[in-house]
Structure formats: C-alpha cells, structure tokens
C-alpha cells in the first residue's frame, strides 16, 4: 500500500504564516510516521517541492503539481480493487469545494483525482457525483457509510435522491448496502467545515464492527448528535445482514477551541501496513483511545500523532491521507 498526501498553496483555512508553518509541520509528522510502514508520495504545489523535501526528510517521494489545498482524502481518487482478479482502478469523484463554499478554491484540486490515478498507473473512472473521500467509509464486504448532509447536499448534488446517490456509489465502489447517518458533528458545519463528513464520526474497524465518536459531556451539542448517530448504527444491518457492533470512542475532554465547539475526534485515523496513525490532542483521553485502538487492531502498531494543528485547519489525519492498495501479484494496475 502507498500513501498519497499534499502540500498545497496557502489555504483559506490558514490565515497566517504561523498557522501555515504549524500545519505543515503536523502534515510532515504524519507523512514521516506513515513512512515507517509504507511508501509515501506527497504532491507539492509549484515552487514548493524543495521546501517539502526539506520538511519531510529522506524516503518520501515529492511530485510537483498545481494545487489549491491539501486535503488529499477529499481531492484524491478512491482506489478500488476487483475481487475476482485483484485489478485496481480509481474513482475520480467530482469535487466542487465541499459544496461550492465561498472560501474554497478548486480549479486545480478538481483535477487531482485523475493525476494521482495516473501516478499510480491505474485507470481513473470519472463520476458525475459530487463527493469527497472523507464522505464515505466502507467495510470491504459491500457496506458503505454515508451522510445525508453530504451526498444529498443541494450545493453538491442538487435534486439528487437517496436512491440515485446509492446507485452511483454502489456502481463505483462495488457496494450493495448503504447506511445513512443523519448528519455529522456540530463543528463540521462551521465556516471551514465539510457539512458532515462521516470519517470524523464513524468508521469500520472490520466488517460488522464500527467505531463511533461519542461526546460524554451533555454541555456539548454533540452529546445529543452522537446519541442519534449511534442509535442509527445500532439499528442498521450490513450487506451480509449482520447487526453492527458499535464500539464507542469518547471524545477528548476539551469542549471548545477558539470560541467554537470542538470536533476533536479519534475516529479520524489512518490505517497503514501494520500500523494505525491515531489523532492525539494532549488530552487525558488520548491514552484511553490508544488502548482501545490497540485492542481493536492487535496486529498493528498504534502511533499517536498530535493532530491539533491539522484540526485547526479543518480536518484530521484521515483527511490529509489517501491510500493506494498494492497491486495483486501477477496484475498490472
């Protein structure tokens, strides 16, 4: 497996040089951590490749490409593998700046999906569905988690029905069962939010088992939001007809950051070859979350990385990463 990341131009979510430098150090720490487990390729904007190489250190491939931002999960392709023969392809979602938000720019980022597929040497299949990689999560056995406020967002896909969205997604991913969450975390609807990405709320640990963000403190609006979401997950069945086992992952103790409701979440992790790169927040619950993920993934090394600078820019570790599966032996692409 190979990780793709990005180092773009100054982003709207990073207003000052200090914020940019802090975020880029965090981005680099994630890339270096993943490099311990698998190859890493980072896309860098024009004139930024040399600085990226200096920041990332040896062993990380840097490729110069025009970029608007750096959220590779959302602007990159979603790689898929055909079960019968292991052949790979890439879904190139239509990207429009998370619903054409006024602060977003996507002239270059809308092309990244196809460019990354070309770097990987696989065929890219362009889909007319406006979607981002952080807006879905699959179990590898036919089930996909979605959010009503993302795929059915009128600023993304005006007039699209749930059935139409499912048909497009199932055709591309090879899934057959969608579990729709009603919304995302409160903080994700702020100015630089995605309007409900699932990858900060819930993720499959393995088929039949979902980790779900919970907010123990009733003073935070996500306390009720998470109760609703976990209720939906517990009532759902996957593509095999199994009820989902829901493993609750309590949020960090901090409730507000810079006057806004915190959406710090341990769910936004990255699985790599033999490892789990886990968000950390210098919080008392960091150790509890790391222990929980070690129990869930006993054959992987769990490595916490301070994700606060990444969250300050609008996302987490999963949001800045995109995995390319290794080709099956004897196949091309």
Residue ranges and their predicted role:
Residues 1-333:
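Histidine/cysteine-enriched polar flanking segments
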């Amino acid at each position: 497996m190979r990780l793709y990341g990005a180092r773009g131009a100054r982003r709207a979510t990073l207003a000052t040089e200090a914020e940019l430098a802090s975020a880029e150090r965090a981005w680099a720490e994630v890339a270096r951590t993943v490099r311990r487990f698998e190859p890493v390729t980072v896309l860098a904007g024009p004139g930024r490749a040399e600085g990226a190489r200096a920041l990332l250190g040896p062993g990380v491939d840097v490729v110069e490409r025009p970029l608007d931002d750096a959220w590779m999960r959302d602007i990159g392709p979603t790689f898929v593998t055909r079960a019968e023969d292991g052949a790979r392809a890439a879904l190139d979602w239509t990207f429009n700046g998370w619903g054409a938000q006024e602060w977003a720019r996507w002239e270059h980022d809308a092309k990244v999906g196809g460019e990354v597929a070309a770097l990987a040497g696989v065929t890219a299949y362009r889909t007319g569905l406006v979607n981002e990689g952080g807006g879905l999560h699959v179990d590898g056995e036919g089930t996909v988690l979605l959010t009503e406020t993302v795929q059915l967002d009128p600023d993304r896909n005006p007039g699209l029905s749930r059935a139409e969205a499912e048909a497009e997604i199932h055709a591309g991913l090879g899934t057959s069962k969608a579990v729709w969450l009603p919304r995302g975390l409160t903080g994700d609807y702020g100015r630089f939010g995605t309007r409900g990405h699932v990858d900060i709320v819930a993720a499959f640990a393995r088929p039949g088992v979902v980790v779900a963000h919970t907010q123990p403190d009733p003073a935070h609006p996500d306390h009720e939001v998470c109760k609703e979401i976990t209720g939906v997950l517990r009532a759902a069945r996957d593509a095999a007809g199994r009820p989902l086992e829901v493993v609750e992952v309590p949020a960090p103790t901090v409730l507000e950051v810079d006057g806004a409701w915190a959406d710090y979440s341990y769910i936004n992790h990255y699985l790599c070859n033999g490892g789990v790169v886990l968000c950390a927040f210098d919080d008392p619950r960091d150790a509890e979350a790391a222990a929980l993920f070690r129990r869930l993934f006993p054959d992987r090394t769990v490595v916490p990385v301070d994700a606060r600078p990444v969250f300050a820019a609008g996302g987490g570790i999963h949001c800045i990463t995109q995995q390319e599966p290794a080709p099956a032996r004897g196949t091309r692409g």
